[in-house]
Amino acid sequence: MTTLPTKSKYVIIGAGIHGLSTAWHLAAQGETDVVVLDKTGIGAGASGIACGVVRNNYFQPAMRRLMAHSVEVWESDPEAFSYHPVGYMQISPAVMEKDITQIYEEQRAIGYESELIEGAGDCDNYMKKIFSDWRARGVTSVLHEKRGGFANNQASLEGLAKKAKAAGANIVCGVTVTAFVKDKSGTVVSVQTDKGEVSCEQVIIAAGPWVKSFWDMLQLPAKVASGANMWRYWALEEGVLDVPPTFLTRDDGSLPPVIHIDSDTPLCDENGKEITDKMWGIYYKPDFHFNGVQGGAAPYEVLRPVNEVKIDPYGPKSPEFIVGEDFARMWCSALSFCHGRFEGMLKKFRHEPSGGLGCFTPDSFPVFDKFCENVYIIADSNHGYKMLGVGKLVAEELRGEKSELLTPFRFSRYAEGTTHPVSNSPFPWS
C-alpha cells in the first residue's frame, strides 16, 4: 500500500465511484492535498459489483437534473470510464403512463434527448423493429432515452483512480477507519485508522453501504423528524445468463439499449406456475465484462433491526445476502416474458454468488450534506454508481461553491417535509 500520511487537507473515506470522483475533481481543481482511504481496495464495495447502468429515467425532477449532469461526465471520456452509450428504455404498463409522460416532458425541458411511444399497438411495433422476438404483453408506453447506457464496473473505477492519481490525489488501501477525533466545537480534527492517525481540515465520507457505521461514529441522529429510522438495508438481486453477450443484440446485430420493464401482468414460469400477480420489474443488457446477459430485479427490504445487519463480508462473499433459486426463476421467466429467445433458458442461469446490500435513507433518495462543521457525507441510497458527476459537484461545494443540483438532497428535507415524490414503479430507487 502507499504510505499513510500523517496529515492531509482532505481525507476521503471510500475508494468507490464517489470517493474517487471527488478526489479526482478536487485534485483537478488544484486541491492536491487529498488522500482516499479504503479498508480493502479500489471498487471493493458496491461500485465494484454494480450492474453499471447509466440512466436519466427518474420520476423525481431533482434526480433527473442530477443524472443529466452525471451522464455528461460519463460522456466526457467513454474510453477511460469503459462506458457504452447504447441508450436506455423504460417499458411500462398503463398504471405508470402518467408518470412516464411527466418524465418525458421534463426530459425535453432540460434538453435530455428521449422518445416516447404510447399505446399498446405502437409500443409493440416499436419494440419489434428492434427485436423481432419481442412478446411482452400489457405494455402501453416505451420511454427510449437516446443517451445513457452502461459501463463496466471495475474497469471504470480503475480509470477513475488513474485520473485521480494523475491529478495529484493519493489513494491508500488496506486502511480501516476506526474513529474520528473532534475538538471542543465538534469539528473533526483527525481520522484514526488501524495504521495511524491522519490530521485533516475536511472529511468526505463516500462509503456506500457502510455509511451507517460512520454516521454512528459521528453520533448523528438514528431517526429523522418523522420518527422513521435514518437507515435501512435492502438486498440487491442481480445475476447473469450464461449465453454469449451477442445472444441479446438488435436484429441488425448492434448492441441494444439497456432494457428496463415494469409490468402488472401476472408472471408465470416455464411450467405455467404463477410467480406473482403483483407489480414486478427487471432490467437486463448484453455485457462483455460479465460475458453473458446481465441484469436484475427489484431488491427486497431486510426487515431485521439495522444494528443486527452484517455488511461484511460484502457482496458475493456474503453467506447470507446473495441471490437464490427464487430470483433465478423469476428473472429468467421475466426475460422469457419479453423475448422468445429466452424461452426455456432457466438452465442457463449462472449459479455463482451474486448480490449485495444497499443502505437506504428514509425516502430512498440520497443525502449530500455537511455535518459536524467539516464532514461531508455522500449517502447515495444505492443510486451511486451511475452518479459519476456527484464527485465534481461535491468538490465544488468543498471549495465554497453552492451546488443547485445538490441542494434538494440536504438532510434538512426530513424536518422541512420537502422529500421527493414517489412513483408507481416497484423499484425503491425509481
Protein language model features and the residues they cover:
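Helical element adjacent to the flavin cofactor pocket in flavoenzyme catalytic cores
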Residues: 143-202, 206-213
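Beta1/beta-strand and adjacent pyrophosphate-binding region of the FAD-binding site
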Residues: 3-18, 35
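C-terminal catalytic lobe of FAD-dependent flavoproteins
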Residues: 322-430
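Short beta-strand to alpha-helix junction loop
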Residues: 65-66, 91-99, 143-163, 322-330, ...
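Dinucleotide-binding Rossmann-like beta1-alpha1 core, especially the glycine-rich loop
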Residues: 51-130, 139, 279-282
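Conserved Rossmann-like nucleotide-cofactor binding loop
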Residues: 18, 42, 210
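Glycine-rich FAD pyrophosphate-binding loop
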Residues: 27-47
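Active-site substrate-recognition segment that forms the wall
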Residues: 24-28, 54, 79-87, 198, ...
